[in-house]
Structures are given as structure tokens and as C-alpha cells.
Amino acid sequence: MSSAMPDPVPPRLAERTADLLVERLAAFPTAVRAMVERLSPEEGRWRPSEDDWSIVEILGHLIDEETADFRDRLARLLDDPDAEWPAIDPVAAAAARNDRDRDLAELLASFEKARSESVSWLCQRLAQTPAVEWSLAKAHPRGDLAAGDLLASWAAHDLLHLRQIAKRLHEMLDAVGDPFRIGYAGEW
């Protein structure tokens, strides 16, 4: 077996990582909308088990993360690295708001609005923030967390939930497809 080195990072990515991450953040709502906008209310609320979130609960979580986690924490870190971050509990927040009974279209619109505000804020920050400030860091239970780490994690968080939505749709198709089977598509 060859021990080939991975391809080098494309120059565009290496030279303008923050800009590229903001572009990815801006594109995410379109991907989510394409996956969920035609779901019925029942499909949006469907869970494969009581321990799993439905798609509407995932959307509620994305709104929380948009407003109470990533944007808020990044702003606090850039403006006052020593400021404390409010605690967040995504599972408790979803339960307290009863996200499962919320309207999918309204949640999607709320998420798109919140993300648009975040992207506008990020574009303004990128225009005024020197690159060195992306290395500002804060002690965190998972280790020191730099502003750039938080920005990259925000974009990665989107992909985790895009995967989660795709999995939920796959599970739903498997559950409702009877008598038809989906095994020919391949393993999940």
C-alpha cells in the first residue's frame, strides 16, 4: 500500500480561509431548504426514535446555534476575549420551546433570516478585523478555542446537521417505503 501524501490545500482555501468559510455559511440555508421545504408537517415532525430529533427540532437547534452560540460567542471572543460565555443546553432549549410542534416553514424562514444576519455581521467583521485577531483564543473545556477555530467549527457544524437531515430523510424513506426496500441504494 502506498503512503501517498494527501493533496495540498488548494491555494484559494489557504489564502482566504475566513472568506471561504463565510461563503460556505451563506450557502448552507439553500442546501437545507432544498432538502426540507417540500416535507409535510408530519414528515417534518417524524422521529425514528424518541431519542432522535425530528427535522423541525434540528431546524430549531440551528436557530439556537445561530443566535446563542456561534455568532454570540465569536463576537464576545473578538470584542472581549476574557468575557464569560453564557451556558447553552441545546436539548433543554429544544424541549422548552417544544420545537417538535413548531411549523417547519416558519422555522426555516427564521433560520434563513438569522443566518443572513450572521453572514452580514461576519462580512462587516472581515472587512475591519485584521487576520491576527482570528488567533485570539479563550480557554474552553475542549481546549483553547481561537476565533478562527470557532468560525471553522460553525461551518463544520452546518455540515454535521446537513448529514443529520439527510440521515433523517433516509430513515424516513426506509420506514415509509414498505413494501418497497431501499437496500439496493447501498449501505448508509
Predicted regions and their residues:
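Short gly/ser-rich anion-binding loops that grip negatively charged ligand groups
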Residues: 22, 60, 64, 108
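Solvent-exposed interaction patches of small proteins and small membrane subunits
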Residues: 13-16, 20-23, 47, 79, ...
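Short amphipathic alpha-helical segments at helix-loop
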Residues: 10-17, 55, 96-103, 142-146
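Terminal targeting/low-complexity segments that flank the catalytic cores of oxidoreductases
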Residues: 1-25, 186-187
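An N-terminal domain-cap segment
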Residues: 15-43
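Structural signal for well-ordered, non-membrane alpha-helices
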Residues: 29, 33-40, 67, 71, ...
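Short, contiguous alpha-helical
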Residues: 2-4, 8, 44-90, 133-188
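Acidic/histidine-rich alpha-helical segments that form the ligand environment
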Residues: 24-28, 35, 91-133, 149-154
